[in-house]
């Protein structure tokens, strides 16, 4: 599991005084960076090997500006050419949101998915957490 700590920005609040729902997918993407490095260690977009096939966010509670959040990211499924990253957002040790991102190993030249190799699967398995 990877863990990332972020401080919500004022610009991420809405008229109701809590963090806007549009902020979480951005936070989740930032917290997926360690997984991206398995496929593109230098994060060079010209060598990118992943696409997002699906994202989901389930809100469990409110999140507030100026109060640190923690995002825990783990792998919940590994397929032939895809895997699912499960992400949980905590504020004050309370679970506030859960996200899932289905990532696909992709060849941009062929415009097709590619099977995960054994090394990639092994790296992902190190962060596997059954849901």
Spans of features found by a protein language model:
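HotDog/MaoC-like acyl-thioester-processing domains
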Residues: 1-3, 64-65, 76-131
């Amino acid at each position: 599991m990877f863990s990332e700590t972020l401080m919500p920005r004022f610009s991420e609040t809405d008229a109701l005084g809590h963090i806007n729902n549009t902020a979480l997918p951005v936070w989740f993407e930032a917290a997926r960076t360690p997984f991206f490095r398995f496929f593109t260690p230098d994060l060079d977009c010209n060598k990118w090997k992943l696409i997002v096939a699906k994202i989901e966010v389930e809100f469990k509670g409110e999140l507030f500006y100026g109060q640190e959040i923690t995002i825990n990211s783990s792998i919940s499924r590994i397929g032939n050419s895809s895997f699912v990253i499960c992400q949980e957002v905590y504020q004050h040790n309370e679970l506030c949101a859960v996200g899932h991102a289905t990532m696909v190993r992709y060849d941009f030249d062929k415009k097709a998915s590619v099977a995960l190799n054994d090394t990639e699967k092994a790296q992902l398995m190190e962060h596997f957490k059954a849901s």
